Amino acid sequence: MDTIENLIIAIVKPLISQPDALTIKIEDTPEFLEYHLNLDQSDVGRVIGRKGRTISAIRTIVYSVPTEYKKVRIVIDEK
């Protein structure tokens, strides 16, 4: 696991009710390094938060981690 993936897990796992259902798939696109968070449907609202404030805060923290050559993007998927 890389640093960004560990950071995402450390932030998201305490927020959700079913942490065992959390999986992260990394997709390398030409412009971005995308981290797809697969969550249980009941946990999606917790991670997004009211008016998107929680996911916005998570993205701010994750985007502050320096990467070598690509921008990082977080995508939330439902199971």
Curated annotation (Swiss-Prot):
It comes from the Bacteria. Keywords: Cell shape, Cell wall biogenesis/degradation, Cytoplasm, RNA-binding. Disruption phenotype: Cells grow more slowly, are rounder with less elongation, form short chains. It is found in: Cytoplasm. One of its GO terms (biological process) is peptidoglycan biosynthetic process. Residues 32-79 form the KH domain. One of its GO terms (molecular function) is RNA binding. The keyword RNA-binding applies. The keyword Metal-binding does not apply. GO terms for cellular component: cytoplasm. A probable RNA chaperone. Forms a complex with KhpB which binds to cellular RNA and controls its expression. Plays a role in peptidoglycan (PG) homeostasis and cell length regulation. The KhpA-KhpB complex stimulates or controls elongasome-mediated lateral cell wall biosynthesis. It is not clear what is the function of the KhpA homooligomer in vivo. Belongs to the KhpA RNA-binding protein family. Self-associates, makes at least homodimers. Interacts with KhpB (also called EloR) via the KH domain of KhpB. The complex with KhpB is critical for regulating elongasome activity and for KhpA localization at midcell. This is RNA-binding protein KhpA. It comes from Streptococcus pneumoniae (strain ATCC BAA-255 / R6).
